[in-house]
């Protein structure tokens, strides 16, 4: 996403990535996925964060026009979570975005998403892996409304696995 309008923050345990476009946040010793994320997001000042994990390769060019539509929607609707990829079809909310049911599997999917930082911090629990968070965090999120998903992929990706 060469012309990304966002300030990029890279969470790393100890290494730095030197670029004028990227701010590295070092979280220190690896304890767990959720501990690392909790430590990292405490450094962020924004109310909303776009979360992309390192095991995804972007497949297509990202549309800044579509991003601007999504960004405006977030500003107007104040969601707790907005999934940017299609997994489970959401219920109709408006022409751009659908609503994720209150109780649904993988409600807190780690797919590319925009999170209200305070809600993400509340749902993360120390010691959990990303997979634990998708299962257990989804159950904790049953108490939250305001979870949404796009009808059309904003980000198309290929998942990579390292052995």
Question: Model-found features: residue ranges?
Answer:
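Active-site nucleotide-sugar/metal-binding loop of Leloir-type enzymes
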Residues: 38-48
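Catalytic core and acceptor-binding pocket of nucleotide-sugar-dependent glycosyltransferases
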Residues: 108-163
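Short, flexible, basic/aromatic active-site loop/helix in glycosyltransferases
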Residues: 92-105
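N-terminal anchoring/stem segment of glycosyltransferases
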Residues: 1-29, 41-43
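A structural signal for short, well-ordered beta-strand segments and their strand-loop junctions
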Residues: 9-10, 49-51, 80-85, 114, ...
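Short beta-strand-to-loop acidic/aromatic patch adjacent to the donor-nucleotide binding site
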Residues: 47-57
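Conserved donor sugar-nucleotide recognition element shared by glycan-biosynthetic enzymes
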Residues: 33-37
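Conserved donor-nucleotide/metal-binding helix-loop-beta segment in metal-dependent transferases, i.e.
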Residues: 60-90
